[in-house]
UniProtKB/Swiss-Prot annotation:
Entry's family note: Belongs to the SLC12A transporter family.
PANTHER family (alphabetical): CATION-CHLORIDE COTRANSPORTER 1, SOLUTE CARRIER FAMILY 12, CATION COTRANSPORTERS
Name of the protein: Cation-chloride cotransporter 1
Membrane-side (Extracellular) residue stretches: 154-167, 236-280, 326-365, 427-441, 520-522, 573-578
Keyword presence, Transit peptide: no
Source organism per UniProt: Oryza sativa subsp. japonica
Compartment(s): Membrane
């Protein structure tokens, strides 16, 4: 079809049939949003007049596309009105382009390998709820998640334990990690549209499904466990504020050593602490109540969320006001107000033992140091993913996520550093360590304000965790990578109730543990693992710098991402090497499980780009020079269906892949499986795609490392000639052509096979490709059929050692490892057999090959019949020889009669041939003698390898086929081998 023709109807309404070949095009319509509507190409034209001129034609949807009827407009541009009629229009390209732009990555069929049935519903993404800007969409959620329970009930304790200067180092260290992660997150998030799943989506699309799922599940666990941490923090604060609400009472005796007038004195004090059982009971109740809110859906959560944000900001204001006006008249003695003396006393660290509640105790079971404090404090800087988790609700993700995330990170880090200085100068170390809610004690106007603020802020953070974690799990399940997660799948817009129940179960289990200081290191590991994944993703994408890597956030560099990833790993080991090993082992187990059981997925991840660039670099490093024999690998091109006698649903002979595996040492190497379809490419393109998919499935089923290619050509000879010239790149071109011997040609009366067979062999010789023809492929053993006996080589001509190498490769397989190699040297009558045998033995010894050498002397050619002295083998060969003579004589007579009748020289398949009857008899007799020798010595061999004679020039292909038939007659399993003009083995180390 020409570009101007329309698939649909002409101006007069008469349908225009689409031609059988070629793409189907229609003119550009006004409803086609992917192209520019040109409205001013003529004087006086305008968009209004152009639209008014629209009439008549409703374009038909292309094949394999399901078009949403609601999106089909009633008006399109007719053929005569189209200004871009010359260019034509491919609706498939347009639809795929539109879907790609809206974030639905649909692969456009462009080759037989890409061909899939595409079902597309045309339509714009539905608007889902209000959109938020940078402040409310990213900055505030990040701030709310970062400022959590750790700041209120543990930060003053950390300052008292680590001292001012180590607390500053601690905050800077953890803040640098999250800031660098925020830079990496900003770069990835601004490189395209984001879907649900937050960091899982980013990591999975950058590092692949396996890494994405493994880190995503760990991040899900981190969020679920973080919910329990927030619940415990809220309950602990409530019990501290209202001790009478506890069902169980627990007190701790604190021993303080002081120095008075040079004499050490010890003072004891008894303080009440929340009971573990109270934490468990209230924690489970609060978790269940929060789950009821989560089950109410996003609308209820969005209405409740502001109530948890305002108390956070108000409580911070009250804390700072209280710090600056301290001490008040009723303040404890330990609160000195902002004092330089107190600041100096608290400058250094004073690590000591505490009980499970964090109260100093010389006999306590927990000893704190800087590494342990990193694990305790790091959750106070997490929460930077809150904005990316809400990408679907943002007006402009590529602007809001970088600005909002990094602003929240810098704001909280600056606030933490400022708070270290304030708290270090506010109270004595004893007060910092024993008053678990010092922030409430100093707050203005009353501690109750802080208690309420802490409880509401932590419950809000817990609500966010219980809301985000199920959606993360549902996003992983919806990607359909891990079948075991199918239970958590949800339809678009539905609430993930199953995932919410599972998250609540994990949260309740952690609440039952009841120890906040033991839970936080676990959360830290999972969050650090996720942050390391984000940094590694940006590092890989930045380093590869693929054409698709064009983030709008320009302030990034691969070195910053690498430093961020290393910081994450260092912090993990600083906290606890045992927790680190466990978390990495868990992620590795999930990775292995996904790679083993997960479904295949290609998200265009960075690893694929890395493999591509590595392959290009390796290919360039190989150069165009010949590979040294020490580095030579067989790259077989497997000719799958050369003679066309397999069922249509069988893409390749079942034993060809078994034989291809036998040509590789320990599976190293690559095979190229090729099949040729006779016909016109435009007509058979879809058939080629289907055949390619079937062949790919066959290769995967046979566990053979190889690729499938389907070629459509007018004839098998032309198709093979194209393959042998163009297949492969540089030194990765196939060097061995493997195909089945056409045993069926005479039985099926396929008279075209001889000429095709000869043409293929001649093409291989001209292209300098080795040839391996397998006779008896139906009887070729699989990997479970062990063979015994010998592998016999009939070494007639020098082939660069290919035949010897093939025999050694066969021995490396379990099927043939029990066999021994015998080398038969075919010598003329006047050759010194013993000298030849010694030379061959020395040659094999230098090649590190173990084989028995046998010299067979054949009499010079004499056109006479010999009597058999060895019984059946000679009789079998004799019968085949006589039959071949008779068929050749008949065929030659017919050729002569045809040439005489039509008055032209001897012709075969339209080509002139030269017939020398004496040479024909000589060639035939040589094959007879060789076949007789093979049957005499190697009838029971596991495999026989023999040299392939090249087709004589201008010789009838039918005669050559008769020679080959006589050679392989009655030999059950044979490899006919022809090397090429180079060595594949070497003496040297």
């Amino acid at each position: 079809m020409e570009n101007g023709e329309i698939e649909g109807a002409a101006d007069d309404g008469v349908p225009v049939p689409a031609p059988p070949n070629g793409r189907r095009y229609r003119p550009v319509g006004s409803s086609d949003r992917a192209v520019i509507q040109m409205t001013s190409m003529e004087p006086g034209s305008s968009s209004s007049t152009a639209v008014a001129a629209v009439s008549g034609i409703t374009p038909q949807p292309p094949r394999n596309l399901t078009v949403d009827p609601s999106m089909q407009e009633d008006h399109t541009v007719s053929q005569g009105d189209s200004k871009l009629e010359l260019f034509g229009f491919d609706s498939l390209v347009n639809i795929l382009g539109l879907k790609s732009m809206t974030g639905e990555q649909i692969q456009a069929p462009s080759s037989p390998r890409d061909g899939e049935d595409v079902a597309i519903t045309i339509g714009r993404p539905k608007e889902t709820g209000p959109k938020f800007g940078t402040m409310m969409g990213v900055f505030v959620p990040c701030l709310q998640n970062i400022l959590g329970i750790i700041y209120y009930i543990r930060f003053t304790w950390i300052v008292g334990m680590a001292g001012v200067w180590q607390s500053l180092v601690l905050v800077s260290f953890c803040g640098a990690c999250t800031f660098l992660t925020g830079i990496s997150l900003s770069a990835i998030a601004t490189n395209g549209a984001m879907k649900g799943g937050g960091p899982y989506y980013l990591i999975g699309r950058a590092l692949g499904p396996e890494v994405g799922v493994s880190i995503g599940l760990c991040f899900f666990l981190g969020n679920a466990v973080a919910g329990s941490m927030y619940v415990l923090g809220a309950v602990e604060t409530f019990l501290d504020a209202v001790p009478s609400a506890g069902f169980f009472k627990e007190s701790v005796t604190v021993v303080n050593n002081t120095l008075v007038n040079g004499t050490a004195t010890a003072s004891t004090a008894t303080i009440s602490t929340p009971s573990l059982h109270d934490l468990q009971v209230y924690g489970v109740i609060v978790t269940i109540l929060l789950c009821f809110i989560v089950f109410g859906g996003v609308k209820i959560i969005n209405k409740v969320a502001p109530a948890f944000l305002i108390p956070v900001l108000f409580s911070l204001l009250c804390i700072y006001l209280g710090v600056f006006i301290a001490p008040r008249h009723n303040a404890p003695k330990g609160i000195t107000g902002l004092s330089i003396t107190t600041f100096k006393d608290n400058w250094g660290s004073e690590y000591q033992r505490t009980n499970n509640a964090g109260v100093p105790d010389p006999n306590g079971s927990i000893y704190w140091d800087f590494n342990a404090l990193v694990g305790l404090f790091f959750p106070a800087v997490t929460g930077i993913m809150a904005g990316s988790n809400r990408s679907a609700s943002l007006k402009d993700t590529q602007r809001s996520i970088p600005i909002g995330t990094l602003s929240a990170t810098l704001t909280t880090t600056a606030m933490y550093l400022f708070s270290v200085l304030l708290f270090g100068a506010l109270a004595t170390r004893e007060e910092l360590l024993t008053d678990r809610l010092l922030t409430a004690t100093v707050a203005w106007p009353a501690p109750a304000v802080i208690y309420i603020g802490i409880i509401l802020s932590t419950l809000g953070a817990a609500l966010q965790s219980l809301t985000g974690a199920p959606r993360l799990l549902a996003a992983i399940a919806n990607d359909d990578i891990l079948p075991v997660l199918n239970y958590f799948k949800v339809s678009e817009g539905a609430e993930p109730h199953s995932a919410t129940l599972f998250t609540a179960f994990i949260c309740i289990c952690c609440v039952v543990i009841g120890n906040l200081d033991l839970i936080t290191p676990t959360i830290t590991m999972f969050f650090l693992l996720c942050y390391a994944g984000v940094n590694l993703s940006c590092f890989l994408l930045d380093l590869l710098d693929a054409p698709s890597w064009r983030p709008r956030w320009k302030f990034h560099h691969w070195s910053l991402s690498l430093v961020g990833a290393l910081l994450c790993v260092v912090i993990m080991f600083l906290i606890s090497w045992s927790f680190t090993v466990v978390s990495l082992a868990l992620a590795s187990l999930i990775y292995y499980y996904v790679s083993l059981k997960g479904k295949a997925g290609d998200w265009g991840d960075g690893f694929k780009s890395a493999y591509f660039q590595l392959a290009l670099r390796s290919l360039r490093s190989l150069g165009a020079n010949q590979v040294h024999p020490k580095n030579w690998y067989p790259i077989p091109l497997i000719f799958c269906r050369p003679w066309g006698k397999l069922p249509e649903n069988v893409p390749c002979h079942p034993k060809l892949a078994d034989f291809a595996n036998c040509m590789k040492k320990k599976g190293r190497g690559m095979s190229i499986f090729v099949s040729i379809i006779d016909g016109d490419y435009h007509e058979l393109a879809e058939d080629a795609k289907t055949a390619c998919r079937q062949l790919d499935t066959y290769i995967e089923y046979k566990r053979c490392e190889g690729v499938a290619e389907i070629i459509v050509a007018p004839s098998m000879s032309e198709g093979f000639r194209s393959i042998v010239q163009t297949m492969g790149l540089g030194n990765l071109k196939p060097n061995i052509i493997v195909m089945r011997y056409p045993e069926i040609w005479r039985r099926e009366n396929l008279i075209q096979i001889p000429s095709t067979f000869v043409s293929i062999i001649n093409d291989c010789i001209i292209a300098n490709k080795a040839v391996v023809i397998v006779k008896g492929l139906d009887e070729w053993p699989n990997e479970y059929q062990r063979q015994y006996g010998t592998i016999d080589l009939y070494w007639i001509v020098r082939d660069g050692g290919l035949m010897l190498l093939l025999s050694q490769l066969l021995l490396t397989k379990e099927t043939f490892e029990s066999c021994k190699i015998q080398v038969f040297c075919i010598a003329e009558e006047d050759t010194d057999a013993e000298e030849l045998k010694a030379d061959v033995k020395k040659f094999l010894y230098d090649l590190r090959m173990h084989a028995e050498v046998i010299v067979v002397t054949m009499k010079s050619w004499e056109p006479h019949m010999e009597s058999s002295s060895s019984g059946a083998p000679q009789d079998d060969s004799q019968e085949a020889y006589t039959s071949a003579q008779r068929r050749i004589s008949t065929y030659l007579s017919e050729m002569k009669e045809t040439a005489q009748r039509e008055g032209h020289p001897l012709m075969e398949d339209g080509k002139q041939v030269v017939v020398n009857e004496q040479k024909i008899e000589k060639f035939l007799y040589t094959m007879f003698k060789l076949n007789s020798t093979i049957l005499r010595y190697s009838r029971m061999a596991a495999v026989v390898l023999v040299s392939l004679p090249p087709p004589p020039l201008n010789h009838p292909a039918y005669f050559y086929m008769e020679y080959m038939d006589l050679l392989v007659e009655n030999v059950p399993r044979m490899l006919i081998v022809r090397g090429y003009r180079r060595d594949v083995v070497t003496f040297f180390t």
